[in-house]
Regions:
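Helix-loop junctions and terminal segments of transmembrane helices
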Residues: 6-37, 95-97
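Alpha-helical transmembrane segments
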Residues: 94-102, 150-165, 216
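Membrane-interface helix-loop junctions in multi-pass transport and translocation proteins
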Residues: 105, 112-150, 179-201, 220-221
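Membrane-proximal transmembrane or re-entrant/amphipathic helices at the cytosolic face
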Residues: 182-242
């Protein structure tokens, strides 16, 4: 679900990239590509952080009848899978952007290699890590897919150094969100109450932190739901730019 949501919002930018490709506007491709990547990361990374921090509470709510050993297995597997959320979202959005540039063959090659690696890693890890091997196979598939697709996209569009700074900012904010969510997970024992309060507080803090840090510039999110509210908040928090 987090991957679907992040890709659904980010992929709305892909037609603009296709239009820029037809005009051979490399700057526009690079700019809109950065927006799509940041949007996918902002949503998927936060979702992954919440999954990891509240993994024990999520399992307790969804599967209250599991015994202790089963619960520990499910929690660990959920934590492993949480790493695939941002990587899966990025893999899909980079693939969509490459196809918008009309380089579909590159995606076929990259996906074929990623699937082959996933099968190999899963087969090896299952013999050593049991059920967790499937999770490690998913991580390998997503990670290699991101690396290959991102490499091809930036070969086609050129590097974007500002995006590196923005991604670093998003990562730093999510570290803080993890610590905040982890505190709720530790100190509130009731699973439902911990999840509800922790998620609401962390979500609010996350939006404020993203707006304050200026992850998105100007009209970068034009057409995205709630973009006007986000920019109004960002302008108030970044008052020194007014």
């Amino acid at each position: 679900m987090p991957v679907v949501l992040s890709v659904a919002l980010s992929v709305a930018i892909v037609p603009v990239i296709a239009s820029a490709t037809a005009k051979r506007d490399i700057d526009e491709i690079r700019k809109k590509g950065a927006t799509a990547v940041k949007l996918a990361l902002v949503i998927s990374t936060f979702a992954a952080v919440m999954m990891f921090a509240f993994s024990d509470k999520i399992i307790a709510v969804l599967y209250p009848r599991l015994n202790r050993a089963e619960t520990e297995t499910a929690v660990r597997l959920l934590r492993i899978i949480s790493f695939t959320v941002p990587m899966g979202a990025l893999r899909e959005i980079y693939a969509s952007m490459i196809m918008a540039i009309d380089k579909t063959k590159k995606i076929i090659v990259n996906n074929s290699f990623s699937v082959a690696l996933k099968i190999a890693v899963t087969a090896i890890c299952l013999s050593y890590f049991n059920v967790y091997g499937a999770g490690y196979g998913m991580i390998a598939f997503s990670a290699v897919g991101v690396i290959l697709n991102a490499r091809d996209f930036y070969i086609l569009s050129g590097k974007n150094l500002k995006l590196v700074k923005n991604v670093s900012t998003i990562a730093a904010i999510n570290v803080i969100m993890f610590l905040l969510a982890w505190a709720f997970d530790i100190y509130i024992k009731n699973p439902i109450l911990s999840l509800a309060t922790g998620f609401v507080v962390a979500s609010f803090a996350y939006v404020v932190a993203a707006a304050f840090s200026g992850v998105f510039d100007g009209d970068e999110l034009s057409g995205v739901p709630f973009s006007r509210a986000y920019y109004k908040l960002s302008q108030k928090l970044r008052f020194w730019e007014s």
